[in-house]
């Protein structure tokens, strides 16, 4: 069937409509394309289709510098001009606020601010992950394809920090060589690199048990210039693997990055935004929204290793920082020591169970993709805080949660600023400023 792509979804697909008006999610097309597509599923309210050929290409199309972008799943929007990507991300936020958050067009027009971005649309990632596969009887490392069941062998990735582009090929080659003579049981391999500090860490994710530590360390050190090589040991069922421990095979045993005025050290399992320059925009927006005073008490929920905790502690009298992930809590404590900050209480545990008893003047929440639990919203709404900064990585759960805040009647969103941390993909962060209803 011939279809014209109307807009991009919050996902890799474009959205088109049949002559009868049925929505069709089309893989392989971008806004403005006219395509010949074949249906792969057809439900009562929407269908899915795959582009067979582009009949008339969109003026928004762009040439990708990546030779793998047509088959690799890492940059699904690489074929679209960057300005069009930014416009689509803004529109996805507006759409979610209207459809899910039930905000009016006038409210959205006032609330949503122009999207912010860092300088680089390529070469921005400080982290990349490689997955193992068996090809022609040999172990190969590569990236997940658009078909998630396939691993694409790559020699480089234009999304990764340019200075360290050759590291991918070196690591993949060294481990591929080793894995074909020793059973490394690799689950995945993470590479973190910082242009600012020069730190490069290779993290090997494997099950617990025997492991040729010395041999692996020597081969990787010979093949790459790294500051740290670690093994992250995991256990549990395949779909619910958890970290059992981390051991340093060579070097520092952690990765160091400079963000804003802070220096942070992170263990391999800990989360850190993959786009450091754009993460600094998040920090600026959070601090602008909260505008903390020296005598005030702040609360940082889902604080991770301290991305927002550290700048808050510089400006507030005291900060309670709550994080459920053990490795991140340990990293937070270490980062507080590095920063010589003693006005922060790191609290390990669930954000709801460990919600501080003392009311904070300002709060920042940076929950996972699932958003805030209803109980968390109720607790925040029950405080006497004057302002809340909500950092979200999913517009759908953000819109749902903002509606819940409005329904609670204590806080109302005054601004929502999208920030493009992930160029060439559909993902987008948003910082929302909520203030107490007068």
What are these regions (language model features)?
Residues 4, 10, 211-438:
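Rossmann-like S-adenosyl-L-methionine
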Residues 38-42, 131-135, 192-196, 437:
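Short beta-strand micro-motifs enriched in acidic
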Residues 190-194, 198-210:
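Carbohydrate-binding surface patches
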Residues 16, 32, 75, 189, ...:
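Residue-level signal for inorganic ion chemistry
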Residues 52-64, 70-184, 196:
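Extended interfacial segments that mediate partner engagement and assembly in macromolecular machines
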Residues 113-120, 187-192, 417-422:
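Short, solvent-exposed loop/turn elements at beta->coil junctions and helix N-caps
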Residues 1-68, 98, 148, 345-346, ...:
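Terminal RNA-binding accessory module
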């Amino acid at each position: 069937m011939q279809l014209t792509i109307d807009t991009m979804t919050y996902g890799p697909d474009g959205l088109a409509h049949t002559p009868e008006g049925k929505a069709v999610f089309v893989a392989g097309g971008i806004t403005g394309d006219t395509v010949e597509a074949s249906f792969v599923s057809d439900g009562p309210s929407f269908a899915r289709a795959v582009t067979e050929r582009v009949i008339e290409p969109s003026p928004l199309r762009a040439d990708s510098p990546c030779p793998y972008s047509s088959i690799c799943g890492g940059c699904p929007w690489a074929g679209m001009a960057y300005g069009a990507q930014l416009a689509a991300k803004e529109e996805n936020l507006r759409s979610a606020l209207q459809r899910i958050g039930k905000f009016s067009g006038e409210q959205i027009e006032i609330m949503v601010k122009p999207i912010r971005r860092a300088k680089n649309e390529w070469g921005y990632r400080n982290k990349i992950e490689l997955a193992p596969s068996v090809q022609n009887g040999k172990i190969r490392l590569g990236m997940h394809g658009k078909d998630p069941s396939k691993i694409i062998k790559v020699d480089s990735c234009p999304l990764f920090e340019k200075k360290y582009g050759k590291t991918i090929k070196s690591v993949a080659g060294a481990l591929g060589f080793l894995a074909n003579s020793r059973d490394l049981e690799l689950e995945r391999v993470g590479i973190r690199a910082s242009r600012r500090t020069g730190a490069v860490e290779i993290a090997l994710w494997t099950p617990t048990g025997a492991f040729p530590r010395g041999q692996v360390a020597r081969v990787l050190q010979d093949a790459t210039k790294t500051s740290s090589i670690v093994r992250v040991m995991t256990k549990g069922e395949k779909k619910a693997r958890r970290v059992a421990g981390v051991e340093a095979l060579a070097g520092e045993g952690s990765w160091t990055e400079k963000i804003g005025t802070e220096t942070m050290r992170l263990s391999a399992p800990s989360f850190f935004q993959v786009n450091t320059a754009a993460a600094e925009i998040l920090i600026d927006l959070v601090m602008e929204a909260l505008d903390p005073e020296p005598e005030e008490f702040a609360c940082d929920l889902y604080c991770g290793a301290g991305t927002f905790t550290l700048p808050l502690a510089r400006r507030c009298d005291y900060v309670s920082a709550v994080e459920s992930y053990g490795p991140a809590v340990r990293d937070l404590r270490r980062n507080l020591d590095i920063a010589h900050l003693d006005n922060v209480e790191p609290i390990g545990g669930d954000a709801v169970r460990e919600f501080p008893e003392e009311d904070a003047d300002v709060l920042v929440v940076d929950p996972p993709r699932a958003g805030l639990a209803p109980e968390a919203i109720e607790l925040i709404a029950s405080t006497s805080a004057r302002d809340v900064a909500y950092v979200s990585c999913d517009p759908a759960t953000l819109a749902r949660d903002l509606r819940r805040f409005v329904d609670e009647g204590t806080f109302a969103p005054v601004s929502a600023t999208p920030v493009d941390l992930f160029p060439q993909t559909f993902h987008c962060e948003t910082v929302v400023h909520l203030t107490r209803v007068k």
